[in-house]
Design a protein with these regions (language model features):
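Jelly-roll (double-stranded beta-helix
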Residues: 1-304
Length: 304
């Protein structure tokens, strides 16, 4: 008999500024790493003000991780030290494995209405893969299957499997699943997940009950004391839902529907040494990576 996962913890994304001045909401980062292993960071960038995104993320290094960029609206111009140039457009995904090291830039441009929106997820690599050759999975919107389920539920499968349909991103070491799910009001979405994996949901818009219980959970909300706690059993937009143990998730909507990312992966369970865009296992490995970046020996594969 399957066990539906209960909510372990919920929290709201928090505003921050990254890159050369990009305003975004950080769903999770450094402080949550032990709970969300193998995932390190999730940024939500949504704005209709070009001043908040046009300066972008100029040239910077990565080593030891994968960055997964999912654009909802607008365009991101991408270039890297391997000589690649391209666009990540609305509905596209770029799954970049930095491995031993890559230097790249990401410059958001927005759409005709100056709207820019999307997400970037960072996933850790195990020690055995941190120095692998960098690689890309550039996936266009039309290559991402969308499955229609009972009640008008729709799910885009970026990575993983739903109803026998497999997403285009495969052969990832932590065996992740990455779905974009839309659940209309008055319906319930259930989905099997692997018991050994960590599972989270991130609410893009709308609201819903993210397990079968209706217990109230503490939410951090911006208030007079910045992190006041508010009790609620409904998870709304820009909320992270961290699940406990089990082999199935269930999301129910009443009057209003909900759209969310459902992300899961196998924990690596290794030490994490992290500073800025580089994530290794030890402080010595981290020191060496930045030393190599400064002296021009950072790139191990491809063009420098």
């Amino acid at each position: 008999m399957s066990t539906v996962r209960r909510i372990k913890k919920v929290w709201k994304s928090k505003p921050t500024i990254e890159g050369a001045g990009v305003h975004l909401k950080r769903a999770f980062g450094y402080d949550q790493v032990p709970q969300l292993d193998p995932f390190l960071l999730l940024d939500d960038f949504r704005s209709d003000n070009p001043d908040h995104y046009l300066k972008g993320f100029p040239w910077h290094p990565h080593r030891g991780i994968e960055t997964i960029t999912y654009v909802l609206t607008g365009v991101v111009e991408h270039g890297d030290s391997m000589g690649n140039r391209g666009l990540i457009s609305s509905g596209d995904v770029q799954w970049m494995t930095a491995g031993s090291g890559i230097i790249h830039q990401e410059m958001p441009k927005g759409d005709k209405k100056r709207v820019m929106s999307g997400f970037q997820l960072w996933a850790n690599l195990p020690a055995s893969h941190k120095m692998m050759a960098p690689r890309y999975r550039d996936v266009k919107n039309q290559q991402i299957p969308e499955v229609s389920l009972k009640g008008g539920i729709k799910a885009k499968i970026i990575c993983g499997k739903l109803n026998g349909v497999v997403g285009p991103v495969q052969d990832i070491v932590t065996d992740p699943e990455y779905l974009d799910v839309t659940v209309p009001g008055g319906t319930t979405f259930t989905h099997p997940v692997r018991r050994e994996q960590n599972v989270l949901a991130y609410v893009i818009e709308g609201e819903g009950y993210f397990d079968q219980g209706r217990d109230s959970y503490g939410h951090e909300v911006i208030g007079a004391n910045y992190f006041d706690l508010k009790r609620s059993c409904i998870c709304k937009d820009q909320t992270v839902v961290l699940y406990g143990d089990g082999d199935e998730v269930s999301v129910t909507c009443e009057r209003e529907g909900v759209r969310f990312l459902l992300i899961s992966g196998r924990p690596i369970a290794e030490p994490v040494a992290w500073y800025g865009p580089i994530v290794m296992n030890t402080q010595e490995e981290l020191r060496l990576a930045f030393e190599e970046y400064q002296n021009g020996t950072f790139i191990k594969h491809g063009k420098a």
